[in-house]
Amino acid sequence: ALGLKAAGILPDDASQKVDPLFLELSAISRQSDFSGAVERAAPSVVNIFTRKSAAAHSSDAIGVNWDGDPETHMKALGSGVIVSEHGDILTNYHVVDGISNLSVALADGRTFEAKLRGKDVETDLALLQVKAEGLTAAVLGDASKLKVGQTVLAIGNPFDVGQTVTAGIISALGRHGFGLNSYEDFIQTDAAINQGNSGGALINLQGELIGINSAIFSPDRTEAFVGIGFAIPSSIINNVLPALLAGRNIERGYLG
């Protein structure tokens, strides 16, 4: 506030005397504030878990149900993204593969039982459905506008600690040949993606969904994040989601 008059009014030519470094730092600060994008996208990101019943043991004082009834335990599986206000949730197929008892926890704390509505194994995408009202659906972004170096945010539930946001950049586009899916066109990012983030959202700074976080590269197979994560781009989502919503099989052409 140096140089201000007592009344707090700047002289007319004050803008010409502002330190350029101050203006540069202010611009950087604005670019680093991702709260607007997070506020738009975070309500659409959910936690996917399974409920498992286990009989209580009277000899174990930890978690015993003293009524002797089976106790319900929850195991986090991954994350998902609400894609319609009617309760449709997109996630990775590998997150829910073989799980019959699925539940979803919304960002507002509500939980619902979920059912598998459709799947596309070849792109590792699956569609769940919950019966819930007041849902916020993600807005799908345009993958054709993505560029290497753009800032992106990953939202999910790593290690079941609760909804978490990490920031990074698009490190590469069109990554393939990993043998993870039959159809690969991954966005590579250095935004931290850890166990539990699978099925969660990769968003741009407008809060639009540009990818579904799917896998990480871990050279020592410890599942520790080393700065190389992969997301299924919105272009593939655009191709697969309409069929899943309509309950149709995904039809693809083959050469031969």
Residues of each region from the PLM?
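Serine-dependent protease modules
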Residues: L2-G256
